[in-house]
Amino acid sequence: MGGGDLNLKKSWHPQTLRNVEKVWKAEQKHEAERKKIEELQRELREERAREEMQRYAEDVGAVKKKEEKLDWMYQGPGGMVNRDEYLLGRPIDKYVFEKMEEREAGCSSETGLLPGSIFAPSGANSLLDMASKIREDPLFIIRKKEEEKKREVLNNPVKMKKIKELLQMSLEKKEKKKKKEKKKKHRKHKHRSSSSGGSSSEDEQSQARSQKKMANSFPVLSKVPGYGLQVRDSDRNRGLQGSLGEQRAIKNNSRSRSSSPPRHASKKSTKEERPRDRRSRSPSRRSRSPRPSKPHTSKVNRKERDSPSPKKEAYQRRHASGYTRKLSAEELERKRQEMMENAKWREEERLNTLKRHAREDEREHRLERLDSRSGKFLHRMKLESASTSSLEDRVKRNIHSLQRTSVALEKNFMRR
């Protein structure tokens, strides 16, 4: 039985995973520190180079020397001497006074005011300084990179082809959009011109549209003439439905035969009347007996054709399937109270559901906290097993630890 290298089980062994990880982390940390130090050194070198270049430019005269507010901290005792103090009788060091005079005497040579200094080649240095400034400008570097990228794109035929295709697609989309807008404008203009021809057909079309919207939005309740009740279309008087459908058909026939409105207006009126005819046909009417006999309908058609009554048409439009009577103030108040009660009930239901979910979440979090504690989960499982097990199970589990008799000692001790 070989246990392998026992040194690998020691905490100090260098080949264990933990020690290898520690070494790797220390190396990474050392490498990061080294990179940071190199970066700081590089920044210091660049800053020193900039300061030297600035100082050189100020010495040559290419750049105006800026007045720093903290120069007095770096000046010697001679820089803080005030000459007016001598006039006021205050003592001034003679050495400092001489130094200041020497500095003033040598100022002309430093600033280039000596005879013949105007012919000194100072322009080249200023040009070099300006060129170095332009090269180090970050905005100039960004512009240069952008120009290089543009040049690469222009020199690459594949990219140029893709760009041309994209431009062509965008132009085609714009042209299609313009064509659609032109067609829409033309259609609107045509519709306005046709609507100006027949004012009566326009009124009927608007009424039909409003009735269609009301019928689609909610189940229609229409008022039966002579009663104050509101009933559904399916429970309405079937004879009234049949008569209304016949009268609409007669009206359509008379309107189609009349030659007063223009051609396109009559087409639109027939198109708008068709959905009204479809709405008037309810399932109860389909299941009823067929229409009255043909002679009777022909008489009615003849009468309607000879003398059309506008009052009857207005009554039919008013009592069509989409018409509802105006509610009184009491009914409006009652509906408002019902809506408020419904909203209150919904708010209570929402709060109850939120509370229930909050209780469930709290119970889950509590169970998770109990399970996450060390030993609590096993303790709970032991309690559950103890509560469900019987006395026989406990005796069988402890059978090997029970005291044996003399008969059991005489038997083979290896057997169980």
Curated annotation (Swiss-Prot):
Pfam families: Cir_N, CWC25. Residues 301-316, 327-343 have a biased composition (Basic and acidic residues). It is found in: Nucleus. Residues 175-193, 277-300 have a biased composition (Basic residues). It comes from the Eukaryota. Residues 20-70, 324-413 form a coiled coil. Keywords: Coiled coil, Isopeptide bond, mRNA processing, mRNA splicing, Nucleus, Phosphoprotein, Spliceosome, Ubl conjugation. GO terms for biological process: mRNA splicing, via spliceosome. The modification Phosphoserine is found at S170, S222. GO terms for cellular component: nuclear speck; nucleus; U2-type catalytic step 1 spliceosome. Residues 251-263 have a biased composition (Low complexity). There is a cross-link at K382 (Glycyl lysine isopeptide (Lys-Gly) (interchain with G-Cter in SUMO2)). Residues 164-343 are annotated as: Disordered. PANTHER family: CELL CYCLE CONTROL PROTEIN CWF25, PRE-MRNA-SPLICING FACTOR CWC25 HOMOLOG. Belongs to the CWC25 family. Identified in the spliceosome C complex. Involved in pre-mRNA splicing as component of the spliceosome. This is Pre-mRNA-splicing factor CWC25 homolog. It comes from Mus musculus.
